[in-house]
């Protein structure tokens, strides 16, 4: 399935039906009074969270969405039928913005959550409503009001507890495939991951959702590489695992420089991202060169005024993964006591996969 995380759509609620001008036409009542019914109300446009969805693909090619109009009133005091609501289903984590102003209208997260995003027009009153002692035969009725319409931007921000960030080819996809049942595409070249992947990780008697965020590069906050389209998914994460490639980085790159560069991109995108708790891990330590680079980074960051722990991990051999997951779990659940059991166990099924 293609992953689509931002779309622009136009929604139009149904118009209210017009009220009717009609008269009683019954035997033995030659001058029957007004009997025009009211018009029906127009249908609303409603957004509803569907937990089975993980992308906005359905709205990529269908941009116009209109609810039903209310029916007109008729004689014999009969009101028009209300127009049916139009329910648009969206995945959890959908943020809705007004396309013209950029104002955030709602943030939809809970399964089944509903919000009326465009209100249907009100049905007009029939002439029977305007009869009075001074005007017993009104020859007019009220028109229905038009339904609301607006342009919307739908943005999907993944609902994950933990985000895995780092340069392309840092080993993010391999890591998530080891600690969960997610099975992302893995290859030894940059930008293999073009869509975020979600996996559920079991830790002690709890679980949390991890997102493998596609690789970031310098300038990502301004749209370079895969751009800030994926940085938005990090915003909801409570904790970040920052992976640093220890083995064979590109010429001119080093683990410390990679770490600082990605942190600079997070800070440039949002102050809130820069403040999120991070667990730093050097990957691929099954390669001697990477292990040596990891030990060096441990010493560098350990000498800071506020020391930063660095985990050395190998997704190939599993070394260091238990300690890494313990650090993540404690950061998420604020548990200070060290875990005396095994590491993160796999659950039977990931929460979602794009």
From Swiss-Prot:
Name of the protein in its database record: GTPase Obg
Q: Where in or outside the cell is it found?
A: Cytoplasm
The record's EC number reads 3.6.5.-
Q: Which family does it belong to?
A: Belongs to the TRAFAC class OBG-HflX-like GTPase superfamily. OBG GTPase family.
Which terms in the Gene Ontology molecular function aspect does this entry carry?
GTP binding; GTPase activity; magnesium ion binding
Q: What is the annotated quaternary arrangement, including any partners?
A: Monomer.
The entry's function note states: An essential GTPase which binds GTP, GDP and possibly (p)ppGpp with moderate affinity, with high nucleotide exchange rates and a fairly low GTP hydrolysis rate. Plays a role in control of the cell cycle, stress response, ribosome biogenesis and in those bacteria that undergo differentiation, in morphogenesis control.
Q: Where is the Obg domain?
A: 1-159
Which Gene3D superfamilies did the record assign? GTP1/OBG domain, P-loop containing nucleotide triphosphate hydrolases
**Keywords, sorted A to Z:** Cytoplasm, GTP-binding, Hydrolase, Magnesium, Metal-binding, Nucleotide-binding
Domain annotation OBG-type G: ranges:
160-333
Q: Taxonomic lineage of this organism?
A: Bacteria, Pseudomonadati, Myxococcota, Myxococcia, Myxococcales
Q: What class of enzyme is it?
A: hydrolase
By its UniProt entry, which InterPro entries does this protein fall under?
Answer: G_OBG, GTP-bd, GTP-bd_Obg/CgtA, GTP1-OBG_CS, GTP1_OBG_dom, GTP1_OBG_dom_sf, OBG_GTPase, P-loop_NTPase
């Amino acid at each position: 399935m293609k992953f689509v995380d931002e779309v622009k759509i136009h929604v139009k609620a149904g118009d209210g039906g017009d009220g009717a001008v009609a008269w009683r036409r019954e035997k033995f009542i030659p001058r029957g009074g007004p009997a025009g019914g009211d018009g029906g109300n127009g249908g609303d446009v409603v957004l509803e969270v569907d937990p089975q969805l993980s992308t906005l693909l359905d709205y990529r090619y269908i941009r116009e969405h209109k609810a039903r109009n209310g029916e007109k009133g008729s004689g014999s005091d009969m009101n028009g039928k209300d127009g049916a609501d139009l329910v648009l289903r969206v995945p959890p984590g959908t943020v809705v913005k007004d396309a013209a102003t950029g104002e955030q209208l709602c943030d939809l997260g809970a399964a089944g959550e509903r919000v009326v995003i465009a209100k249907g027009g009100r049905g007009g009153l029939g002439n029977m409503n305007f009869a009075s002692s001074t005007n017993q035969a009104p020859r007019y009725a009220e028109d229905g009001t038009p339904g609301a319409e607006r342009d919307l931007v739908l943005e999907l921000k993944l609902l994950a507890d933990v985000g895995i960030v780092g340069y392309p080819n840092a080993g993010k996809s391999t890591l998530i495939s080891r600690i969960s049942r997610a099975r992302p595409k893995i290859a030894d070249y940059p930008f293999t991951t073009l869509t975020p992947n979600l996996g559920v990780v079991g830790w002690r008697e709890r679980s949390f959702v991890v997102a493998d965020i596609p690789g970031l590069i310098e300038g990502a906050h301004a749209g370079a590489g895969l751009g800030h389209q994926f940085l938005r998914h990090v915003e909801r994460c409570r904790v970040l695992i920052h992976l640093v490639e220890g083995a064979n980085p590109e010429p001119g790159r080093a683990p410390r420089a990679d770490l600082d560069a990605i942190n600079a991109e997070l800070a440039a995108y949002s102050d809130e991202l820069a403040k999120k708790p991070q667990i730093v891990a050097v990957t691929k330590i099954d390669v001697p060169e990477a292990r040596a680079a990891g030990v060096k980074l441990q010493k560098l960051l350990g000498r800071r005024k506020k020391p930063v722990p660095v985990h050395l991990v190998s997704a190939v051999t599993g070394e260091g993964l238990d300690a890494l997951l313990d650090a993540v779990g404690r950061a998420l659940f604020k548990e200070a006591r060290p875990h005396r059991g095994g590491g993160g166990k796999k659950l039977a099924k990931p929460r979602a996969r794009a």
